Amino acid sequence: MTLPVNPVDNLAALIRCPSVTPAEGGALTALEKMLKLMGFSANRPVFSDDNTPDIENLYARKSGNGPHLMFAGHTDVVPPGDEKDWKHPPFAAAIEDGVMYGRGAVDMKGGIACFVAAVARHIEKHGNIKGSISFLITGDEEGPAVNGTVKLLEWAKQRGESWDASIVGEPTNPNALGDMIKIGRRGSLSGTITVHGVQGHAAYPHLAENPVRGIVTLVDSLLCPAFDEGTANFQASNLEVTTIDVGNKATNVIPNKATASFNIRFNDTWTAESLQAEIISRLERAARDNRLRQGRETPIKYELTWRERPSHVFLTHDEKLIGTLTASVEAVTGKRPELSTSGGTSDARFIKDYCPVVEFGLTGQTMHMVDERVALADLEGLTQIYERFIADFFG
């Protein structure tokens, strides 16, 4: 029996599966075959929810006496766009000049391929694992993230599963393998503001109420002053206006409605609830103190809608998990990785409620891009890091 010790072969098998969210595309089946070669038991639960597609997931475990390590990730990928723009077909796993091309190469089929290879090498050398390893893999990370990791964790917990630590194999390195380990993430909160006015002719503004004035005023109240100056482990909270829309193509008509959407990435100065309260306070004050039209007595009329579920800020403090991974990275790459909380959200935001979690994978320079690709040398390097981590974590 040949174990899946080669990360290049593993990744090629996964890339050739067109698993664009929500399609499974054969990726979980390919992964399950690799894991069963190593004696893992596997389940493929499918989760559903209103107004979202059904999603297939995978939970596989190889049990032993000792701590339980979870590797988490996703096999779904974003659409490749126009395939004519690619140097090589996005699902062909073509190799040229020591580089493999394909959608998901770094985000994050590459990380999965390397961890599979690392486990296989450990088993090949040592015969067993002094503990348990599980793979918690979803097909719903790039999509709504409703029927994926969040439900798979609860599903596993209800069946008696618990974990001592987790690694998420997202591409964490900005420039080169070994740059960065993610030990936490900022929270994320999104909302939409709608201001109602009175439509009218642009030449007769006294007969109308321009909601654009109101939306600009309210948005400005959220942009200034700054929410905070950052903390010891997190950069300053940051709000970005992502859309402003009036739905008006005519240049001589004052619209009757204006909307603006925003997203704020926040640090541990705030909880989602305290930040929502701060935003509401700023908007109410700005609406009360300003008008849509000079001489108008009533305040700005607006509605605030929170979009999606907020992601909560978190920071991992587990010394064994962080220290062992840091030492493994340094031993293989010769670099001491930065411990960071930068970047966007990931499924680690769900895992943190079940066990300590960190993130470490490939470099992310080409993720989601045309010609997404990974150096074969990086696949081997990441596999060696994971293999060393497994050996040291289980002692």
UniProtKB/Swiss-Prot annotation:
Sites binding Zn(2+) 2 sit at: 107, 142, 368
Q: Which domain of life is it from?
A: Bacteria
Active-site residues, Swiss-Prot/TrEMBL: 76, 141
Supply the PANTHER family for this chain: ACETYLORNITHINE DEACETYLASE, N-ACETYL-L-CITRULLINE DEACETYLASE
User: Per its UniProt record, what SUPFAM superfamilies does this chain match?
Assistant: Bacterial exopeptidase dimerisation domain (SSF55031), Zn-dependent exopeptidases (SSF53187)
Reported function? Catalyzes the hydrolysis of N-succinyl-L,L-diaminopimelic acid (SDAP), forming succinate and LL-2,6-diaminopimelate (DAP), an intermediate involved in the bacterial biosynthesis of lysine and meso-diaminopimelic acid, an essential component of bacterial cell walls.
Pathway(s) where this gene product acts: Amino-acid biosynthesis; L-lysine biosynthesis via DAP pathway; LL-2,6-diaminopimelate from (S)-tetrahydrodipicolinate (succinylase route): step 3/3
What is this protein identified as?
Answer: Succinyl-diaminopimelate desuccinylase
Q: How is the cofactor bound?
A: Binds 2 Zn(2+) or Co(2+) ions per subunit.
Mention one GO biological process in which this protein takes part, according to its record. Answer: L-arginine biosynthetic process
- The answer to whether the entry has keyword Hydrolase is yes
